[in-house]
Design a protein with these regions (language model features):
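Conserved beta-propeller blade signature
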Residues: 70-73, 135-138, 198-201
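Structural signal for beta-propeller blades
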Residues: 79-81, 144-146, 208-209
C-alpha cells in the first residue's frame, strides 16, 4: 500500500543573535521554500513508499533550529529524531544525527521493543531549551513522556539526560499506569516549548498544560504549574 512522502521545507536566513526567550532561528522566508528535506524531488510529494534512510521522512510533526546552526526534525512516523549539524542548504541533504532508532534504515515504535532511553514512540513536538539555549526537548507522545538533553546531541544514539512524565526511562504507560494524573505524569504530550526560563508541555490526553520553572534536572520531576485542570 502506498504511503505519503512528507517534506520539511525551510529557507536560509541571515544569522543573528537570538532573543533570550526564543533561541531558535527563524525558518520561514517570504519568498517561499528554498530547501526541501524528506525527498530528493518535490514531485515525490505524491503517493510513494517511504523507506527509512538519512534522507527520508514519514509524517514529520515538529521542527526547530538552534542558534549554533543545528536543525532538528521529529520524524514522527519513523519514530525518530533527525539532526543536521548545520542548516541544510541543498535539497535532500542527509541527516547527520539519528535519535530513537538503531540505524537509519530501521523504524518502528520503540525500535520494535519497549520504551527505554534509546527509543521513541510517535515523537512530535521538539524545542531548543535551556537558559543558554544549548539543550533539546522532545515530546515523545505515545511513550507519555518528554525527553530532555541538557546539551544537544552531537552524535547519533546520544542518550537524554532527563525524562519527565515517567519515573525512569523504562516507563511508557499513560499517567504511569495510574487512573488519575498528577503533576508528574503525562498522557499524549504532543507539544513542548521553552520561553527562555520555563518549559511548557501540552499534556493533550489530560486536557491541560504543564510548566516547569527552569529545565528539569531529575527524572520524573513534577511540574510547578498546571493550567486547564484543578
Amino acid at each position: 500500500m502506498a504511503t505519503i512522502t512528507a517534506h520539511v521545507s525551510l529557507a536560509p536566513v541571515a544569522r543573528r543573535a537570538p532573543a533570550a526567550a526564543a533561541p531558535c532561528a527563524p525558518l520561514l522566508h517570504p519568498a517561499g521554500a528554498q530547501v526541501i528535506l524528506g525527498a530528493t524531488d518535490d514531485a515525490l510529494g505524491m503517493a510513494a513508499p517511504v523507506v527509512p534512510s538519512a534522507k527520508s521522512m514519514f509524517g514529520p510533526r515538529g521542527v526547530c533550529a538552534a542558534a549554533d546552526g543545528s536543525f532538528w526534525v521529529s520524524d514522527t512516523g519513523h519514530h525518530r529524531v533527525l539532526g543536521w549539524r548545520r542548516l541544510p542548504e541543498a535539497d535532500g541533504t542527509p541527516a547527520d544525527i539519528l535519535l530513537g532508532q538503531p540505524p537509519f534504515d530501521r523504524e518502528g515504535r520503540n525500535a520494535g521493543g519497549n520504551a527505554n532511553e534509546d527509543t521513541m514512540n510517535v515523537p512530535t513536538g521538539i524545542a531548543v531549551c535551556g537558559r543558554d539555549g544549548a539543550g533539546l526537548a522532545v515530546a515523545d507522545a505515545w511513550n507519555h513522556r518528554v525527553l530532555i538533553w541538557h546539551r544537544r546531541p552531537t552524535q547519533s544514539y546520544q542518550r537524554p539526560d532527563v525524562v519527565v512524565g515517567q519515573s525512569d526511562f523504562d516507563g511508557g504507560q499513560s499517567n504511569r499506569g495510574h487512573s488519575q494524573p498528577d503533576a508528574g505524569t503525562l498522557f499524549w504530550p504532543y507539544c513542548v516549548a521553552w520561553d527562555g526560563e520555563r518549559l511548557w508541555v501540552a499534556d493533550t490526553g489530560n486536557r491541560r498544560v504543564l510548566m516547569w520553572n527552569g529545565l528539569p534536572q531529575i527524572n520524573g520531576q513534577p511540574a510547578d504549574l498546571i493550567i486547564g485542570q484543578d
